[in-house]
Amino acid sequence: MRILEKAPAKINLSLDVTSKRPDGYHEVEMIMTTIDLADRIELTELPENVIRVASHNRFVPDDQRNLAYQAAKLLKERFQVKKGVSIMITKVIPVAAGLAGGSSDAAATLRGLNRLWDLKLSVEELAELGAEIGSDVSFCVYGGTALATGRGEKIRHISAPPHCWVVLAKPTIGVSTAEVYRRLNLQQVRHPDVQAMIDAIEEKSFQKVCGQLGNVLESVTLSLHPEVAMIKNQMKRFGADAVLMSGSGPTVFGLVQYESKVQRIYNGLRGFCDQVYAVRMIGEQNALD
């Protein structure tokens, strides 16, 4: 038997860090939404009791470092599943980009194995399991648009943002999320108004959403990696309505209301950045199929 699952990327429309917890994690408030840039996960049942992960992308690990592997291992151990599975990951989301590609692959694996192994778990139960794998996995199990709090595992669904285009550009650098958080000084950064973003989304006001974009991690990453700031400036110059870094970076996204502007922005960025994408905002939970 074979199961196919879609694993869409997410962007942060608003990302605030409110405090550091005793366990080393940070308390966050994030508005996350899914976009139409997705990996494909193919799950095939194996007769032997093993987990095999494969991908055509050489940057995708095929062992326990892979979050999809961890998702399968968690389900096997928690529910005493004696069957094996082959997990084929077709990567479309760039790796280590701040777009939750690995987390979304893990979430898709949880959803798919729930069907393949007939575990009959609810989406809420899958999301709770996802939180054991990584902070973004809970959101990715659901998809759509949500306010994430705690360390990112507490999910409250909100309306989808107004429809628009999203242009993304990822420079060829790596960003250490741990270093970004370590350098973050919560007293010296401008904190986004997360509630104002929720209100803008509920009003379906594209202009207000653009006005409330904010990421408390952005100033840290920009200070470490000037290339990210350069991409932000170029994206604005080419005509994006609003521009922000996603997650801890290095990917920058621009919101674009009118399709007529998208190609110019895309072409302009392709002149100096290899990984550029122009996709639609999804933002709805039922859009994963």
UniProtKB/Swiss-Prot annotation:
Its EC number is 2.7.1.148. ATP binds at P94, V95, A96, A97, G98, L99, A100, G101, G102, S103, S104. The active site is at K10, D136. The keyword Kinase applies. One of its GO terms (molecular function) is ATP binding. Transmembrane segments: none annotated. Keywords: ATP-binding, Isoprene biosynthesis, Kinase, Nucleotide-binding, Transferase. Signal peptide: none annotated. Pathway: Isoprenoid biosynthesis; isopentenyl diphosphate biosynthesis via DXP pathway; isopentenyl diphosphate from 1-deoxy-D-xylulose 5-phosphate: step 3/6. GO terms for biological process: isopentenyl diphosphate biosynthetic process, methylerythritol 4-phosphate pathway; terpenoid biosynthetic process. It catalyses: 4-CDP-2-C-methyl-D-erythritol + ATP = 4-CDP-2-C-methyl-D-erythritol 2-phosphate + ADP + H(+). It is an enzyme of class 2 (transferase). InterPro entries: GHMP_kinase_C_dom, GHMP_kinase_C_sf, GHMP_kinase_N_dom, IspE, Ribosomal_Su5_D2-typ_SF, Ribsml_uS5_D2-typ_fold_subgr. Catalyzes the phosphorylation of the position 2 hydroxy group of 4-diphosphocytidyl-2C-methyl-D-erythritol. Belongs to the GHMP kinase family. IspE subfamily. NCBIfam families: ispE, PRK14608.1. This is 4-diphosphocytidyl-2-C-methyl-D-erythritol kinase. It comes from Bacillus velezensis (strain DSM 23117 / BGSC 10A6 / LMG 26770 / FZB42). The gene is ispE.
